[in-house]
Amino acid sequence: MDDRNEIPQDGPASMEPEGVIESTWHEVYDNFDDMNLREELLRGIYGYGFEKPSAIQQRAIIPCVRGRDVIAQAQSGTGKTATFSIAILQQIDTSIRECQALILAPTRELATQIQRVVMALGEYMKVHSHACIGGTNVREDARILESGCHVVVGTPGRVYDMINRKVLRTQYIKLFVLDEADEMLSRGFKDQIQDVFKMLPPDVQVILLSATMPPDVLEVSRCFMRDPVSILVKKEELTLEGIKQFYVNVKQENWKLGTLCDLYDTLSITQSVIFCNTRRKVDQLTQEMSIHNFTVSAMHGDMEQRDREVIMKQFRSGSSRVLITTDLLARGIDVQQVSLVINYDLPSNRENYIHRIGRGGRFGRKGVAINFITDDDRRILKDIEQFYHTTIEEMPANIADLI
């Protein structure tokens, strides 16, 4: 059985998180060679740029490889995707052209990214993996799945559809991974996940991963799992180290645009992400920034899948430097060069705050998060500070020196 987690695009030079690890699994492996992994998988790991396992990888890969159900919680950017990807690749039998591992992710972008990681780590293994996501051609999806893929990564709706059509065969699946479990088990996906789960073999191994795991999610997850190993980062450590957090007082909503333009006139920014709470606001802000001669890209869930992929590609390559988006991007998308995250709107759900600001400091990279605060937002800001045991200070005049 296998397990798999989220891995960034560059090597893990500074991957060791500062966070406190609590674990019911006490074996710790501080290098990949001691994990008794396949030779061709090790080649893929080192070829991908990894030198040593991160804290979560040191603890979670082996119980996953040994077939245990695992609840793993770690900060965004600590190598979660690699954790379950490595465990999956260690366990699959590539001589059987059937789906042996099924990974669900909350967004198409995250599913696509995970699939890329599996293919990269499994480069020397003749592994077949497919991203089964909405917004793509159903017939083509069905054709690829019918021909057999060892690892399928997808969004819940499309995966359920493909199982129903009998083109995604489930009888060989030995591992079921839920990435970003808090989001996946939230109201929107809970029923779909349960529908998929019911169609899997009864002895399937289950892995749940997320940056945040509220008690109710842990409770729900236990319905799926047998005697799971828990590997958790203490909640107060979850605000990412290396991210400087500030707020800017903006008296009224309609003053935000001027404040944003002033910021961009002042700062020299490699790349930045601006979060708004609604798709409409994303479109509106994109239009207003363009009128003020700022070059920006926008992405949200109303867009065609092809358009979203083009925008993400441009942003990853650096040809687009400012991306305005909703929480669609907040979960798990690796964009390595992001130096600044701006919460144009504070997230309506405090759980999303860490997913948003985690965009700026993956793998120990330094980053700055700036929150625009109206008078109505003060209570929400206070709530976020208390929830994460953190302090968000007023933005200093020398902000340019910090980015």
From Swiss-Prot:
It catalyses: ATP + H2O = ADP + phosphate + H(+). It comes from the Eukaryota. Keywords: ATP-binding, Cytoplasm, Helicase, Hydrolase, Initiation factor, Nucleotide-binding, Protein biosynthesis, RNA-binding. Its EC number is 3.6.4.13. One of its GO terms (molecular function) is ATP hydrolysis activity. It is an enzyme of class 3 (hydrolase). Its main location: cytoplasm. The keyword Cytoplasm applies. It is found in: Cytoplasm; Cytoplasm, Cytoplasmic ribonucleoprotein granule. Coiled coil: none annotated. A motif (DEAD box) lies at residues 179-182. ATP binds at residues 74-81. Residues 1-20 are annotated as: Disordered. Residues 242-403 form the Helicase C-terminal domain. One of its GO terms (biological process) is female germ-line stem cell asymmetric division. One of its GO terms (cellular component) is cytoplasmic stress granule. Residues 61-231 form the Helicase ATP-binding domain. ATP-dependent RNA helicase which is a subunit of the eIF4F complex involved in cap recognition and is required for mRNA binding to ribosome. In the current model of translation initiation, eIF4A unwinds RNA secondary structures in the 5'-UTR of mRNAs which is necessary to allow efficient binding of the small ribosomal subunit, and subsequent scanning for the initiator codon. As a result, promotes cell proliferation and growth. Binds and antagonises the bam-bgcn complex; probably prevents bam mediated translational repression of shg/E-cadherin. Involved in germ cell formation. Belongs to the DEAD box helicase family. eIF4A subfamily. eIF4F is a multi-subunit complex, the composition of which varies with external and internal environmental conditions. It is composed of at least eIF4A, eIF4E1 and eIF4G1. Interacts with tud and vas. Interacts (via multiple contacts) with bam; the interaction is direct. This is Eukaryotic initiation factor 4A. It comes from Drosophila melanogaster (Fruit fly).
